């Protein structure tokens, strides 16, 4: 005879209802404007840099500067617009003093502990006899 193991078909589930997501309207600004600037002067790392940028419609103007490792200051002035594309002019001014070298941090490796490999007894040898 047939022995039943007590198995049954998997239950059927209904699909979750689908709802249309409400998309937020995308706001288009035909004449965008912004202006930002920042600067960094970190005596500990020697990091010195600055940036300024403005946008009026489709025209972007800005500049950024940084101190090179030799102490000179590199300044890049740039413009971008639909007619001329992106244009940059780089200026370099000799520095009075070289930029401070980053602080060297000594890295000491932790000591490595060595242990002898464990010793094991020899594996038993098996043989056979032919009768």
Swiss-Prot record:
Keywords: Cuticle, Repeat. Sequence repeats lie at residues 9-12, 15-18, 109-112, 116-119, 122-125. GO terms for molecular function: structural constituent of cuticle. Residues 31-101 form the Chitin-binding type R&R domain. It comes from the Eukaryota. The keyword DNA repair does not apply. GO terms for cellular component: extracellular matrix; extracellular space. PANTHER family: CCP84AA-RELATED, STRUCTURAL CONTITUENT OF CUTICLE. Component of the cuticle of migratory locust which contains more than 100 different structural proteins. The tetrapeptide (A-A-P-[AV]) repeats found throughout the protein are also present in many proteins constituting the protective envelope of other species. This is Cuticle protein 7. It comes from Locusta migratoria (Migratory locust). The lineage of its organism: Eukaryota, Metazoa, Ecdysozoa, Arthropoda, Hexapoda.
